[in-house]
Regions:
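Short beta-strand->loop structural element characteristic of the AMP-binding/adenylate-forming
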Residues: 7-9, 36, 59-66, 135
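Conserved AMP-binding A3 loop
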Residues: 1-17
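AMP-binding/adenylate-forming catalytic domain of the ANL superfamily
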Residues: 295, 320-344
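Conserved AMP-binding/adenylation subdomain of ANL enzymes
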Residues: 16-33, 41-82, 97
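Conserved ATP/PPi-binding loop(s) of AMP-dependent carboxylate-activating enzymes
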Residues: 169-176, 186-220, 258-260
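Gly/Ser/Thr-rich phosphate-binding loop
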Residues: 81-86, 95-165, 178
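Active-site glycine-centered loops adjacent to acidic/histidine catalytic or metal-binding residues
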Residues: 115, 139, 171, 233, ...
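AMP-binding/adenylate-forming catalytic core of the ANL superfamily
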Residues: 84, 202, 207-208, 227, ...
């Protein structure tokens, strides 16, 4: 979704190990049926919804197009699927499709979002429409791909309640995975709720980048005998072990000497946009070079009229306490650039903003 595409070398141990980790945390059983609608050229699709059910011997029902919400819903209903994985982008489409009845998703016991940040408005709208909670996970192709995941709460053998999820986080590290938060310059490990670079270690960490030793050395670091993947993500871990993603380090704009998170701006804007049930409004915040400020923030938004922009500008001015976070420009575009995996294309968005 950003930078030049790289080939990621995943070994048999990486893939089999992560598939086993995933199966363990979601407690797959012989009665489970998983929906296989994610692209197979994407680590989430090939490992979680293809290899994992094959290895575990559970049923997988496939659909070729994850953007076809009604087709996916019919599949879930017909085969009484119990597990569905997707992205925030795809789940958003399902909430807008008025042909999908809540009963079509009734059999699902677990819905997991990954690959990109789960937008709060999507989570809330999905729960409102279908009565189902979306649990957010986190990882990267370089981690085969799952490193952490939120899960439903459950009753322990001693009848205490095990908290499996916290909204706004990406869950706890999955078994066999170590996540550290470190200072991005010194790699000194930081404390609880301190924000820094996220490092991941475990059986799922890749061998390296294909025919690119230089780049591999930049992202794999050995600490106390363990190999860690340097994610490029800024985050923190709370007192209960739940991981929160702040943003990509590359998704910060420097204005007035202050580092501004583009993701944080998106979070604020998502709370200001009033989505109607049939609304196709989509947006992304990016930054481009500016002669005066060095950088300027641009909001790209689709499927709106000029009158809507005027109202949105007023809301932004009223609700943004940090004035540096206010977009310098709002551009109406036909569509927000997306990759085949459903992720927003940050590079294409930056070009579109110029």
């Amino acid at each position: 979704s950003e930078g030049i595409p790289k080939g990621v070398e995943l070994t048999g141990d990486n893939i089999l190990g992560n598939a086993q980790q995933i199966a363990n945390i979601i407690n797959v059983n012989e009665d489970d049926t998983i929906v296989g609608s994610l692209p197979l050229f994407h680590a989430f699709g090939i490992v979680v919804t293809t290899y994992m059910p094959l290895i575990e011997g559970i049923k997988c029902v496939a659909h070729p197009d994850p953007t076809d919400g009604l087709g996916v819903a019919k599949l879930v209903s017909k085969y009484k699927a119990t597990i569905m994985c997707g992205t925030s982008t795809f789940f958003r489409l399902y909430t807008k499709n008025q042909k999908i009845h809540p009963l079509m998703f009734e059999s699902l016991r677990l819905i997991v979002a990954g690959a990109e940040k789960l937008r709060e408005d999507v989570r809330v709208e999905f729960k409102k429409r279908f009565g189902k909670e979306i649990f957010e996970g986190y990882g990267a192709t370089e981690t085969s791909p799952v490193a952490s995941c939120n899960l439903p709460d459950k009753v322990a053998p001693d009848f205490s309640i095990q908290i499996g999820h916290k909204m706004g986080t990406v869950g706890m590290p999955i078994p066999g995975t170590k996540i550290k938060i470190v200072d991005p310059q010194t790699f000194k490990e930081l404390g609880i709720n301190e924000e820094g670079m996220i490092l991941i270690s475990g059986i799922q960490v890749m061998r390296g980048y294909l025919k690119n030793e230089e780049k591999t050395k930049q992202v794999l670091k050995v600490i106390n005998g363990k190999t860690y993947y340097i994610t490029g993500d800024k985050g923190k871990i709370d007192e209960d072990g739940f991981v929160t993603i702040v943003d990509r380090y590359s998704r910060f704009a420097k204005l007035g000497g202050e580092m501004i998170s583009l993701g944080a701006i998106e979070d604020k804007i998502s709370k200001l946009i009033e989505l109607k049930e049939d609304s196709l409004i989509d947006f992304i915040v990016t930054s481009i070079e500016d002669e005066k400020k060095g950088e300027k923030i641009v909001l790209l938004i689709s499927h709106v009229e000029n009158e809507y922009i005027l109202e949105l500008k007023e809301k932004i001015l009223k609700n943004f306490e940090n004035k540096l976070m206010i977009p310098s420009e709002i551009k109406i575009v036909q569509d927000i650039p997306k990759l085949g995996s459903g992720k927003k294309d940050f590079n294409a968005s930056k070009i579109l903003a110029k």
